[in-house]
Amino acid sequence: MKYRQIVFDIDGTLIDSEQPILHSLQEVLLHVTGRKYPLEDLTFCFGITGEDTLKRLDIQDIPAAMELWFDILRQHESEMVLYGEIEELITHLKKAGYGLGIITSKPRILFEQDFGKFHISRYFHPVVCADDTVEHKPASGPLLKYMELSGAEKEEILYIGDSVYDSKCAENAGVDFALAVWGSHTKTTPANYYLKNPLDLLSVL
């Protein structure tokens, strides 16, 4: 077993949440700034924290905007679904004895809201959320925290994500990275493996 721990990002990797996230952010910005941003101008938000997203958009009252964003996202919760093959993949990995974990830029309250409803969520431990670290992707902090909590060495971990921020986080931590091509906007993001579909992971383990 080359890797002992298989670690996943959430948005764009485990769950298809792109449209709910983009439309809710667009709605927040319309409320706060009076401007309707094109959705394509907001895709940079994937892979970084909500706070960092709002900072880049020059929002002044970030706590209030975040609270509004949470409220609007709750209205779109039913639109967030697992990607095809994910449930089969996770069940297979669990039965095969791999440790499963999550590293996400979501705060824990959103992680529980968006992902906790899926029964496979109970298979993942540890889960590192944005509020668990001072550093966030693309810095190595989230993966270093994962190593601390899991006891795994960097050589034993494969991190799977959809964004360049995930890729850089893995690189900075010295961890191998697989790009979730099925949910990625950047198909040329540096990676050790490129996975067209979730079950393609089985061929590299």
Predicted feature descriptions by range:
Residues 2-88:
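N-terminal helical cap/lid subdomain that shapes the substrate entry/recognition surface
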Residues 5, 137-165:
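Conserved Lys-Pro-Asp/Glu-containing loop-to-beta segment of HAD-superfamily phosphomonoesterases
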Residues 41, 121-136:
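A short, structured active-site edge motif that brings together acidic residues
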Residues 75-102, 108-112, 140:
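Short, acidic loop-to-helix structural element flanking the phosphoryl-transfer center
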Residues 158-194:
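Acidic, Mg2+-coordinating phosphoryl-transfer loop and its flanking beta/alpha structural elements
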Residues 201-205:
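Short amphipathic alpha-helix with an adjacent loop that forms part of the alpha/beta core around
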